[in-house]
Swiss-Prot record:
Effect noted on mutating R19A: Considerable loss of RNase activity
Protein's gene: cas21
Superkingdom of this protein's organism: Archaea
Protein name, UniProt field: CRISPR-associated endoribonuclease Cas2 1
Lineage of the organism: Archaea, Thermoproteota, Thermoprotei, Sulfolobales, Sulfolobaceae
Cross-referenced NCBIfam families: cas2
A GO MF term: metal ion binding
Protein species of origin: Saccharolobus solfataricus (strain ATCC 35092 / DSM 1617 / JCM 11322 / P2)
Length: 101
């Protein structure tokens, strides 16, 4: 059974950050903010995403001032429905009521 997940990341290295974003897109997750993705994952896909992110992170030895931090958070449909959205992108300014997520 699939569950909705939010995946947040704080990655200082541009190449690593771009690899993570491309990986998450390829796995079918939707980017909802610059460093946040969301999508439905069953347990098998979740393990696959987790393993892939670990592989990406382990490819580079980080310097002392660098960060590679990823947080994967499951959320229920009720929690998602109760979300509070503040703001919109420039293209949504005219259609604030049509914000999907």
């Amino acid at each position: 059974m699939a569950m909705l997940y939010l995946i947040f990341y704080d990655i200082t290295d541009d190449n690593l950050r771009n690899r993570v974003a491309e990986f998450l897109k390829k796995k079918g997750l939707d980017r909802i903010q610059y460093s946040v993705f969301m999508g439905d994952l069953n347990s098998s896909r979740l393990k696959d995403v987790e393993a892939g992110l670990k592989i990406i992170g382990n490819r580079k030895k980080l310097q002392e001032d660098e960060r590679f931090f990823i947080l994967i958070v499951p959320i229920t449909e009720n929690q998602f429905r109760e979300r509070i959205v503040i703001g919109y992108s420039g293209s949504e300014r005219e259609e604030k009521s049509n914000v999907v997520w």
